[in-house]
Amino acid sequence: MSRLLLAPMEGVADFVMRDVLTSVGGYDGCVSEFVRVTGSLLPARTYERETPEIRNGGYTASGTPMVIQLLGSDPEWLARNAAQAATVSPHGIDLNFGCPAKVVNRHGGGAMLLATPELLHRIVSTVRAAVPARIAVTAKMRLGVSDTSLAIACATALAEGGAASLVVHARTRDHGYRPPAHWDWIARIADAVRVPVVANGEVWTVDDWARCRAVSGCDDVMIGRGAVSDPFLALRIRGQMARQPSDAEWPLVLGCLADYLKKLRARIAIHHEHGRVKLWLGYLKRTWPQAAELHDAIRRLQDSAEILGVIEHALARIGQQSAPAG
């Protein structure tokens, strides 16, 4: 069976979301939201805040290995911070060359680096030299900034710079998250480099996963928004749940939501829990129409305890409806 990896998603796949989704099961690994590196050495408390998995040996509560992702554009500062991160991230260091966010790109980070393959090579080689050999250094990239003209050059620069593997998101920065994903370009990249390539982009269903593998030629797939829209997608791919979502699974989804909110409330460093739950419901609406109804029910609520009460009431009501008549 190929590997299934949970993608880093800034503002979405935080520590608690990683905990909940990997607890559902099916993932072989996950990557943190990016830790931004500028012109300083980050203190240890930054990693403790952003990636609490380090207190568990780099694993989520369910035992899924987590890799810390760094984002920046200065080779030396990235290397110094990677060396420090490697002391608490035994499963690897990932470098972000794919973030399309304007706030990141205007500082020359993320996907903007795909305009300069030589800088990509320098970053990866400098980081690789600074990190112990036992710690894998990997990279995540897109197909380019505005077009694919440098896609092969960028992938080659990363691989030759020392990246142990590449995750390729099959769109350019300018394409954002608009379909389609160009999985055929992943195949071209995989043919051009001598390191493993992981396919990423527009995998929402089991059928998407199968087509992605067939077109890209990659065994391993990283899933992002599809994992948030369907928490059971990895299990479906592995044949451990029904291939297609159904209304009968909605109580399980409510259980995931309740678990997520309870864990958010327990995290002192997390604020605005109500906004995060509403954000997740926005993704879930793609798979379950009931999510739209629940979103409407909590739309104006600001208190997380009230929202939890609505979720638990919905669960209780389903239980009453399914109970045999006495």
Curated annotation (Swiss-Prot):
Catalytic-site annotation from UniProt: 99
Q: Which cofactor does it need?
A: FMN
- Which positions does the site annotation Interacts with tRNA cover? 36, 96, 177, 276, 278, 283, 299
Reactions performed catalytically: 5,6-dihydrouridine(16) in tRNA + NADP(+) = uridine(16) in tRNA + NADPH + H(+); 5,6-dihydrouridine(16) in tRNA + NAD(+) = uridine(16) in tRNA + NADH + H(+)
Q: Which UniProt keywords apply?
A: Flavoprotein, FMN, NADP, Oxidoreductase, RNA-binding, tRNA processing, tRNA-binding
Q: What is its EC number?
A: 1.3.1.-
The family database entries (Pfam families) matched by this protein are listed as: Dus
* Gene Ontology MF annotations: flavin adenine dinucleotide binding; FMN binding; tRNA binding; tRNA-dihydrouridine16 synthase activity
Q: Which CDD domains match?
A: DUS_like_FMN
Which residues are FMN-binding? Answer: 8-10, 69, 140, 200-202, 224-225
Name the residues that span the membrane.
none
Q: Which family does it belong to?
A: Belongs to the Dus family. DusC subfamily.
- Please give the function described in this protein's UniProt entry: Catalyzes the synthesis of 5,6-dihydrouridine (D), a modified base found in the D-loop of most tRNAs, via the reduction of the C5-C6 double bond in target uridines. Specifically modifies U16 in tRNAs.
The name under which this protein is listed is tRNA-dihydrouridine(16) synthase
